[in-house]
């Protein structure tokens, strides 16, 4: 397994692979890898000749009061996981490699970023789309693998790839959970013991909503009320948003008539966690 830090070096390796007509699976990450990332890597390994994982904490997708400086980093642990699951190359550039000069060009995806995290984290998806555009151009992958836990990100990236004619297939992979139901996240490392216990309220509230939907409830306000009521019973939980949106357009819906995304963002103490599920009639 190679660990490469420069665009020049990674392009040389990729040119060789492309000359040999090898398919490339790409897993973009910010590091501090866990079983959720491992599931993406395993899927990429099954479907491609070569697998690349990028590890880059992207500064332009963080807001001024967000956790860029404290975001957990552990390249030794990450490298071990990547090697275990058969990654061929880790691309781990410095910020100065990705952004050697002040950046004036940005990628925006409209409409899909109006709600959910797009509304609550201004500029976040512009940063995500801009850095992924750079990575797609540098790495030229055949397929890219993203987790469904970041459901809005998955939808936004799919639309960007479609609109800009990137010759890349975007593959969404299911949420991976702890045994007690908490969605795997690098930010779970921030939680103390009590917060970790309190964080289970996210999945519990979504389960109650899913039960109501499966019992025939079609009013999105009622579904939202079920989730809010459950979350409000947890003293350490502070709701950022609870949204029921069309799973394709990500626009709010009142009456549930087709496939919907039920998505929540909740602060447990100072840690912001997200979770979701998709429901199809």
UniProtKB/Swiss-Prot annotation:
EC number annotated for this UniProt entry: 6.3.2.1
Active-site feature positions: 37 (proton donor)
Record: residues binding beta-alanine: 61
Primary residence: cytoplasm
Catalytic function, reaction form: (R)-pantoate + beta-alanine + ATP = (R)-pantothenate + AMP + diphosphate + H(+)
Stretch forming the signal peptide: none
Transmembrane intervals: none
Superkingdom, natural source: Bacteria
The keyword Transmembrane belongs to this UniProt entry's keyword annotation: no
Keywords for this protein: ATP-binding, Cytoplasm, Ligase, Nucleotide-binding, Pantothenate biosynthesis
GO biological process, one term: pantothenate biosynthetic process
Locations listed in the record: Cytoplasm
Positions annotated to bind (R)-pantoate: 61, 153
Classification via Pfam families: Pantoate_ligase (PF02569)
The protein's annotated pathway: Cofactor biosynthesis; (R)-pantothenate biosynthesis; (R)-pantothenate from (R)-pantoate and beta-alanine: step 1/1
Described function: Catalyzes the condensation of pantoate with beta-alanine in an ATP-dependent reaction via a pantoyl-adenylate intermediate.
Family matches, as PANTHER family: CYTIDYLATE KINASE/PANTOATE-BETA-ALANINE LIGASE, PANTOATE--BETA-ALANINE LIGASE
Family of the protein in this entry: Belongs to the pantothenate synthetase family.
Subunit structure: Homodimer.
Protein name according to UniProt: Pantothenate synthetase
Organism: Clostridium botulinum (strain Okra / Type B1)
């Amino acid at each position: 397994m190679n660990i490469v830090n420069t665009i020049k070096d990674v392009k040389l390796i990729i040119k060789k692979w492309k000359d040999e007509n090898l398919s490339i699976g790409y897993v973009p990450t910010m590091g501090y890898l866990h079983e959720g990332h491992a599931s993406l890597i395993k899927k990429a390994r099954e479907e491609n000749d070569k697998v690349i994982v990028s590890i880059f904490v992207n500064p332009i997708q963080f807001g001024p009061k967000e956790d860029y400086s404290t975001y957990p980093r552990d390249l030794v642990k990450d490298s071990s996981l990547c090697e275990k699951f058969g990654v061929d190359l880790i691309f781990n550039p410095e910020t100065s490699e990705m952004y050697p000069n002040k950046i004036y060009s940005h990628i925006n995806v409209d409409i899909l970023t109006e709600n959910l995290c797009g509304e609550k984290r201004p500029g976040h998806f512009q940063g995500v789309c801009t850095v992924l555009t750079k990575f797609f151009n540098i790495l030229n992958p055949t397929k890219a693998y993203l987790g469904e836990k970041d459901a809005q990100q998955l939808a936004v990236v799919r639309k960007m790839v479609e609109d800009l004619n990137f010759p890349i297939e975007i593959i969404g992979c299911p949420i991976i959970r702890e045994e007690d139901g908490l969605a795997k996240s690098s930010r779970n490392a921030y939680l103390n013991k009590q917060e970790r216990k309190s964080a289970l309220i996210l999945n519990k509230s979504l389960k109650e909503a899913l039960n109501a939907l499966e019992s025939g409830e079609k009013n999105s306000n009622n579904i939202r009320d079920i989730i809010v009521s459950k979350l409000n019973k947890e003293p350490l939980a502070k709701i950022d948003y609870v949204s029921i949106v069309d799973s394709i357009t990500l626009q709010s819906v009142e009456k549930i008539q087709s496939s919907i995304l039920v998505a929540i963002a909740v602060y447990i103490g100072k840690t912001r966690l997200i979770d979701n599920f998709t429901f199809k009639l």
